[in-house]
């Protein structure tokens, strides 16, 4: 009896030891795999799939394509019950208002195919009672915008600047950056508008209408008083551990780590991080330049053959947006980025982003950020980080109604933006010509 008990205890101990050994082996393997660069592993192997599954790599298109919008609207408007209200250049108001009208856009962007139309047809639709308007800075692919809004209508051949929908005539109008108009038939129920009214809080406005030089769908706010602060730049040191910058997070955004080999240039004003797949040049003042070496990369939007067409662009945009959000948080810039243009050149796609402060674009002579993909692989990226602070002074912009009246025949749209002026960044109203965006 005692021998049987001792045998049972020994068996239990042996099983426990075996389990512990197996667990230790698994932990050691996981620890080793965590230190391996994803780019150094062949894509179609069990090891690469395990790395992706455990450490957030390519875990499937459904995970990478989040559906989160990468572009912030410049203006939104909702017309119902005999009045038109709108919001502009305010991140919080934009987020709340866009959520309120999203269901309308889902229906408006799920209609028939787009066909080219004329200005008068749009002008006639602008007087409808139930309307919505959505305007972006730049040139955003139509299919991408439709996907963000939950729509099913696709067209991979055009980019959009402004979308307008009239529920009264069941017409969707799309304005391209070149000024071309497209129209689609789409139905949206009245109940969707009624629900949107409960959460959409804007200021009274009107459409410019026909007869002027600006586009007829241009929003003119009643008694507009757009007052914005003047900005100054603050010193940025990406290498200062005490300055609040997360260098490890900056490196991690590009698939590198604090253990990645680097060398210094210009008396340590620039550090160049190098591994087998890529090079990241990091200037302490905020300029980041990423390039790949050979066919590999530490950043991928999707695996070869995983997605094609519009889904590929969606994944590229989502990858760039996520990376850029991580960089901006790590550098504590208090700004955010908005997709501005998508440029195709053969097998390569370049995504260009604007920098926004408080919802207002900050314009420079060079792009704030750009990402070049070849298929799912990030080949190059440039980010010009800046940190701003209000000077304590402010400036009131010329109201859109007055600015629209002063527009020349080739100045069809307007935007508010910051530009460098006498040592500060000052807000002003700018005119845009057809084709200037993107």
Located regions from the model:
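Zymogen propeptides/activation segments of proteases
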Residues: 18, 149-153, 157-206, 317, ...
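Preferential activation on post-signal-peptide N-terminal prodomains/segments
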Residues: 2-6, 16-312
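Exposed beta-strand-loop-beta-strand "reactive/processing" segments of non-cytosolic proteins
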Residues: 247-292, 331-386, 415-438
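Short, non-transmembrane alpha-helical segments in secretory-pathway proteins
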Residues: 94-112, 119, 233-255, 304-346, ...
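Short low-polarity hydrophobic stretches
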Residues: 25-29, 320, 371, 438
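Short, Lys/Arg-rich cytosolic juxtamembrane segment immediately N-terminal
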Residues: 8-12
């Amino acid at each position: 009896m005692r021998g049987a008990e001792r045998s049972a205890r020994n068996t239990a101990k042996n099983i426990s030891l075996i389990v512990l050994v197996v667990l230790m082996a698994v932990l050691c393997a996981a620890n080793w795999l965590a230190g391996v660069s994803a780019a150094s592993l062949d894509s179609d192997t069990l090891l690469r799939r395990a790395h992706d599954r455990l450490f957030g790599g390519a875990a499937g298109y459904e995970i990478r394509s989040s559906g989160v919008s990468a572009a912030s609207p410049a203006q939104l408007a909702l017309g119902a019950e005999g009045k038109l209200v709108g919001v502009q250049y305010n991140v919080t108001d934009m987020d709340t208002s866009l959520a309120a009208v999203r269901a309308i856009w889902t229906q408006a962007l799920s209609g028939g195919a787009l066909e080219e139309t004329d200005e008068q047809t749009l002008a006639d639709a602008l007087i409808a009672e139930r309307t919505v308007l959505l305007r972006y800075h730049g040139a955003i692919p139509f299919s991408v915008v439709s996907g963000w809004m939950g729509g099913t209508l696709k067209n991979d051949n055009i980019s959009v600047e402004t979308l307008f929908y009239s529920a009264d005539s069941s017409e969707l109008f799309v304005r391209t950056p070149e000024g071309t108009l497209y129209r689609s038939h789409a139905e949206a129920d009245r109940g969707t508008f009624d629900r949107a009214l409960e959460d959409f809080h804007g200021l009274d406005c009107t459409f410019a209408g026909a007869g002027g030089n600006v586009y007829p769908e241009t929003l003119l706010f009643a008694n507009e008083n757009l007052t914005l602060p003047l900005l100054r730049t603050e010193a940025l040191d990406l290498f200062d551990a005490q300055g609040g910058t997360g260098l490890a997070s900056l490196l991690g955004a590009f698939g590198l780590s604090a253990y990645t080999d680097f060398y210094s240039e210009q008396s340590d004003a620039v550090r160049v991080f190098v591994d087998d797949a890529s090079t990241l040049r990091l200037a302490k003042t905020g300029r980041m330049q990423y390039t790949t070496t050979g066919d590999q990369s530490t950043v991928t939007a999707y695996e070869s053959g995983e997605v094609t067409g519009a889904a590929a662009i969606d994944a590229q945009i989502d990858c760039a947006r996520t990376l850029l959000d991580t960089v901006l948080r790590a550098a504590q810039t208090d700004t955010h980025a908005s997709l501005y243009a998508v440029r195709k050149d053969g097998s390569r796609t370049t995504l260009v982003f604007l920098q926004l402060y408080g919802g207002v674009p900050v314009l420079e002579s060079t792009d704030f950020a750009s990402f070049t993909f070849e298929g799912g692989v990030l080949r190059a990226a440039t980010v010009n980080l800046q940190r701003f602070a209000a000077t304590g002074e402010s400036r009131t912009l010329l109201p859109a109604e007055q600015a629209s009246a002063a527009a020349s025949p080739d100045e069809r749209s307007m935007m508010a933006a910051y530009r460098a002026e006498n040592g500060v960044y000052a807000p002003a109203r700018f005119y845009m010509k057809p084709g200037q965006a993107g």
